[in-house]
Amino acid sequence: MTTKIFKPDNCNEDQLKMFYDIVVEGKQVNPNGLLNRIKDADYLSFCELNNEIVGVASIKNPDKNYKKDIFKKANVEKFADNFDYEIGYAVTKETHRRKGISEQLIKSLMDKSTSKSFYATTKNDSMRHLLEKIGFAKLGDNYTNDNNEILTLYRYNGKK
C-alpha cells in the first residue's frame, strides 16, 4: 500500500478525475462544483494498492463563508477562525474498506501540512470513530445539512 500526496496543481487531469470519481462513488459529498473544490484543496492524497487507486483524502481550503456557516450551525461560530484547513473527501473504495486506508491517508496529509489547526465534518459513523481515533474531538452540536442529514463537527485535538 503506497500513499502519494500532491498539490492539485501538480496533478494531471486523469488524477483529478480519478479523485473526483472516487469521492462521488462514496456518496458523502454533493458532486455539484466538486471538481473545482478539489482543485482548490491544499493537498490531495491517493492510496495505491496493486496498481489501483483504492482511496483518497484531502486537506481542503474551505471558503470562509462556508466555514462560518458550518460552525454557526454547530453553535460554535466564535471558533470558526481558529481553523485553517478542513480534512475531507476521505473515501476508500468499498471493496477495500476496513484496512486502515482512510486513517493512513488522513495521517499522512496531516503530517505533510505545516498547520495543525484542522477541522472535519461527517455524517458517517465509521468516519466519526476514525476521527476520534486520530485525535479529533467533537465540537459543538450536531447539525442538519441541506439534505436533512445529521452532521458532526470535529476539531483536531493533537496526536494520540
Predicted regions and their residues:
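C-terminal "cap" of GNAT-fold acetyltransferases
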Residues: 144-160
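Short amphipathic alpha-helix that is part of the acyltransferase structural core
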Residues: 1-39, 44-54
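Short, flexible beta-strand-to-coil junctions
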Residues: 48-52, 60, 122-125, 157-160
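A generic local structural motif
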Residues: 30-33, 72-75, 104-108
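Conserved active-site alpha-helix within GNAT-family acetyltransferase domains
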Residues: 122-148
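Conserved acyl-donor/pantetheine-binding loop and adjacent beta-alpha core of acyl/acetyltransferases
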Residues: 35-36, 42, 46-93, 97, ...
